């Protein structure tokens, strides 16, 4: 059994401009809104498979194409240029500490736009890998009621300080901390235990600040783990999912849907 994948069938492409950026956004579904930010190398078939899963579970999904070529498989040498561009692009600030990333302002605007067009109390935002932390930074805007951080990998973990960094500025984190206390803003974070790109120290930083409003799912990827995950397991909600009950990544995907329903409906 392989990871669930899909193509662009049924997705409506529309450019969306905000905060000086314009990206194509792929939309599909009916119900409460979810911004699904793709992982590297972009809107690959695994991300589209996750998008269809959310649509099938009653959500309107908007996927901004921030990098890469939509529909391109997440493998091969074609990955390298996309990764390289992402690491040096100013809007992502991949190595910066205590940084408000310009792309998060765009994502907040997209969340507001989606909220204006969908039912529900607000919208959810899912970030993955390179974009994992952007999902929580987007929650500075009160249109966002639920953030899902799947294997958040920015800033890239090149030092102890980078591993501890929450992936946003102190100003942003203070706003989110206040929203958690006053508005019951909640976040769900996921990682594999052996994944050095999504360090556990980052989760501990956020847990210390947000307390019970920061739910953590850590999937065992140590040698001999019962899920059969390899030592480089990384993509919790896409590449490592096998659609059978009890498979840990599939159960994590189910929890994401449950979490979004709890927060948005």
Regions found by a protein language model. Name each.
Residues 1-265:
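N-terminal cap/leader regions of alpha/beta-hydrolase-fold enzymes
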């Amino acid at each position: 059994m392989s990871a669930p994948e899909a193509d662009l069938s049924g997705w409506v492409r529309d450019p969306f401009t905000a905060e000086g950026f314009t990206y194509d956004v792929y939309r599909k579904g009916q119900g409460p809104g979810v911004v699904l930010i793709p992982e590297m190398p972009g809107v690959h078939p695994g991300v589209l498979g996750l998008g269809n899963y959310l649509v099938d579970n009653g959500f309107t999904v908007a996927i901004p194409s921030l990098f890469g070529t939509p529909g391109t498989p997440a493998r091969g040498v074609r990955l390298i240029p996309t990764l390289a561009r992402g690491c040096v692009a100013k809007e992502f600030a991949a190595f910066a500490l205590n940084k408000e990333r310009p792309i998060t302002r765009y994502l907040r605007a997209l969340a507001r736009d989606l909220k204006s067009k969908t039912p529900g109390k607000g919208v959810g935002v899912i970030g993955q890998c390179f974009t994992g932390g952007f999902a929580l930074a987007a929650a500075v805007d009160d249109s966002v009621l639920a953030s899902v951080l799947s294997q958040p990998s920015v800033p890239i973990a090149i030092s102890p300080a980078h591993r501890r960094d929450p992936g946003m500025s102190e100003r942003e984190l203070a706003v989110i901390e206040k929203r958690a206390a006053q508005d019951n803003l909640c976040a769900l974070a996921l990682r594999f235990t052996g994944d050095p790109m999504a360090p556990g120290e980052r989760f501990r930083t956020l847990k210390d600040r947000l307390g019970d409003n920061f739910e953590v799912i850590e999937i065992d990827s140590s040698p001999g783990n019962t899920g059969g995950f390899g030592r480089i397991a990384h993509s919790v909600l896409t590449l490592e999912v096998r659609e059978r009950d009890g498979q840990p990544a599939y159960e994590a995907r189910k929890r994401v849907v449950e979490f979004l329903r709890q927060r948005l409906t």
